[in-house]
């Protein structure tokens, strides 16, 4: 993977790695379930439920990459920017900047 010094450059490549609609939808579903796990953990005062957050988000993302996009996730090379890109992509879809 190419080296990136700025997030905006990385995000442009990130979107290309997430061009398949099903892959993108699985990422968004994983994020929604992760937020649900966070809400549940807070509401039930159950810190163990927090372990479901990365399982939901990463698990569905890896399925999307493996079976639909057929590539390797950018988060493996850029863990912080890959995670940030995931949430920025979710925001962009919710705001209508990216196609669902």
Q: PLM features: what roles do these ranges have?
A:
Residues 2-14, 70-100:
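Membrane-proximal soluble regions of multi-pass membrane proteins
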Residues 8-28:
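Membrane interfacial helix-start motif at the N-side
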Residues 23-26, 48-53, 81:
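Alpha-helical transmembrane segments of integral membrane proteins
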Residues 26-40:
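Core segments of transmembrane alpha-helices
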Residues 38-41, 64-65, 93:
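Structural signal for membrane-spanning alpha-helices in multi-pass inner-membrane proteins
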Residues 39-50:
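Helix-coil boundary and interhelical linker segments in multi-pass alpha-helical membrane proteins
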Residues 55-69:
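Transmembrane alpha-helical segments that form the membrane-embedded catalytic/substrate-channel core
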């Amino acid at each position: 993977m190419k080296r990136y010094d700025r997030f905006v450059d990385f995000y442009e490549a990130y979107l290309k790695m997430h061009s398949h609609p099903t892959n993108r939808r699985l990422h968004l579903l994983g994020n929604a379930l992760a937020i649900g796990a966070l809400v549940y953990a807070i509401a039930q005062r159950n810190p163990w439920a927090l372990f479901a957050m990365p399982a939901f988000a990463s698990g569905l993302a890896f399925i999307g990459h493996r079976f639909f996009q057929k590539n390797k996730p950018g988060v493996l090379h850029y863990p912080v920017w890959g995670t940030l890109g995931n949430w920025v992509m979710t925001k962009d879809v919710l705001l209508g900047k990216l196609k669902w």
